[in-house]
C-alpha cells in the first residue's frame, strides 16, 4: 500500500514514483456529497494573480468533508475509502446509523467495516473525534480545531500528526508537524490518530505534464526574467548583483515575514524549527 516505482520504459516514467491506490475501495464519489468546483487559476475577485503557478489541470468535483465532527453520540460505519483530487490525503465515507452519510479525512489504520464515533464520551481509538480536554497526554491527533465549532484547520495533509504534550488551565499544549509548540483551547475538537498515506512524501511526478494535470504551472527563475518582471531580472550574464529577494523585493532565504504583535503570538510557545 502506498507508492510504486515505474520501470524506465520512457523518459516520463524513468524517475516516476506514483500512488498504487491499493487502499482505495470505491472509485466513484457519493453524489450527495459532491458539488461543482470552479477554477480560478490563482486569481482573486479583481482578476489579479494572488497565487502564482496555478492554472489548467483536470476538471474536479469538490467533496464536502466533515471537518467539524459535530455529530455526537451516533456511531458511523466506514463504508469506503476514496480518492480526493483536492487534497493529498484520502477520504473515508461514513454511514451513520441514522442514515446520514459524511466524508472525513482518512486516518491511518481505519478500515472498511470499522465503527467510529464523535463526542466527549467517545473511546480513544483511531478515527474517533473528541474535545482536546478528553484526549490523554501523548496521543497522536489530526484535524485540530483552533476555534470551537469552526472545524478542523490544523494537521490535515497526508501522513501528518500532532502530539498532545500537556495541559495548562483552559488550554492544551500540542506539538505540530512543523515542530511548533502551541496552546489550543481545550474545547476544540481533534481526531485520534495520524492522517493516512504517509508515503505521499515519496511521490515523484516524473514529468512536467503530470504537474500540469494537477493544475501546477511552471516556476520561472527571477534571473531569467526582464528587469520589469523581477528584481533579479536583466543584466549581462547570469549574476543579479544583490541579495536574493522575492518578486516583491522582500529578502528571501530565511527572512521572517510573519508580522509582529499578532493576536495568536501568546498561544505559540516555540516557533517552528527547520
From Swiss-Prot:
Signal peptide: none
InterPro entries in alphabetical order: NA-bd_OB-fold, Rib_uL2_dom2, Ribosomal_uL2, Ribosomal_uL2_bac/org-type, Ribosomal_uL2_C, Ribosomal_uL2_CS, Ribosomal_uL2_dom3, Ribosomal_uL2_RNA-bd_dom
Record-level GO BP terms: cytoplasmic translation
GO molecular function: rRNA binding; structural constituent of ribosome; transferase activity
UniProt entry keywords in alphabetical sequence: Ribonucleoprotein, Ribosomal protein, RNA-binding, rRNA-binding
Gene3D superfamilies according to UniProt: 2.30.30.30, Nucleic acid-binding proteins, Ribosomal protein L2, domain 3
Stored SUPFAM superfamilies: Nucleic acid-binding proteins (SSF50249), Translation proteins SH3-like domain (SSF50104)
SMART domains documented for this protein: Ribosomal_L2 (SM01383), Ribosomal_L2_C (SM01382)
UniProt superkingdom: Bacteria
PROSITE patterns in alphabetical order: RIBOSOMAL_L2
CC annotations in GO: large ribosomal subunit
Region of interest (Disordered), ranges: 221-254
PANTHER family, sorted: LARGE RIBOSOMAL SUBUNIT PROTEIN UL2M (PTHR13691:SF5), RIBOSOMAL PROTEIN L2 (PTHR13691)
Subunit structure: Part of the 50S ribosomal subunit. Forms a bridge to the 30S subunit in the 70S ribosome.
Similarity comment: Belongs to the universal ribosomal protein uL2 family.
UniProt-listed NCBIfam families: rplB_bact
Function: One of the primary rRNA binding proteins. Required for association of the 30S and 50S subunits to form the 70S ribosome, for tRNA binding and peptide bond formation. It has been suggested to have peptidyltransferase activity; this is somewhat controversial. Makes several contacts with the 16S rRNA in the 70S ribosome.
HAMAP family: Ribosomal_uL2_B
Protein name: Large ribosomal subunit protein uL2
Organism, scientific name: Sulfurihydrogenibium sp. (strain YO3AOP1)
Amino acid at each position: 500500500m502506498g507508492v510504486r516505482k515505474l520501470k524506465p520504459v520512457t523518459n516520463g516514467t524513468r524517475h516516476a514514483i506514483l500512488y498504487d491506490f491499493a487502499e482505495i475501495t470505491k472509485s466513484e464519489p457519493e453524489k450527495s456529497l459532491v458539488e461543482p468546483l470552479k477554477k480560478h487559476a490563482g486569481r482573486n475577485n479583481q482578476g489579479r494573480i494572488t497565487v502564482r503557478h496555478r492554472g489548467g489541470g483536470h476538471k474536479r468535483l469538490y467533496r464536502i468533508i466533515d471537518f467539524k465532527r459535530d455529530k455526537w453520540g451516533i456511531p458511523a460505519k466506514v463504508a469506503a475509502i476514496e480518492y480526493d483530487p483536492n487534497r493529498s490525503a484520502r477520504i473515508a465515507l461514513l454511514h451513520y446509523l441514522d442514515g446520514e452519510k459524511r466524508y472525513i479525512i482518512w486516518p491511518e489504520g481505519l478500515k472498511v467495516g470499522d465503527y467510529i464515533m464523535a463526542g466527549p464520551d467517545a473511546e480513544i481509538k483511531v478515527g474517533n473525534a473528541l474535545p482536546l480536554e478528553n484526549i490523554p497526554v501523548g496521543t497522536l491527533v489530526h484535524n485540530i480545531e483552533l476555534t470551537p465549532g469552526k472545524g478542523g484547520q490544523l494537521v490535515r495533509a497526508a501522513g501528518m500528526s500532532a502530539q498532545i504534550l500537556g495541559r495548562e488551565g483552559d488550554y492544551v499544549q500540542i506539538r505540530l508537524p512543523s515542530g511548533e509548540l502551541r496552546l489550543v483551547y481545550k474545547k476544540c475538537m481533534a481526531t485520534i490518530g495520524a492522517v493516512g498515506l504517509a508515503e505521499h512524501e515519496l511521490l515523484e511526478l516524473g514529468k512536467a505534464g503530470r504537474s500540469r494535470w494537477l493544475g501546477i504551472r511552471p516556476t520561472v527563475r527571477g534571473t531569467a526574467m526582464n528587469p520589469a518582471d523581477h528584481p533579479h531580472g536583466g543584466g549581462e550574464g547570469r549574476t543579479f548583483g544583490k541579495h536574493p529577494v522575492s518578486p516583491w523585493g522582500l529578502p528571501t532565504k530565511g527572512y521572517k515575514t510573519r508580522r509582529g504583535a499578532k493576536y495568536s503570538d501568546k498561544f505559540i510557545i516555540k516557533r517552528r524549527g527547520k
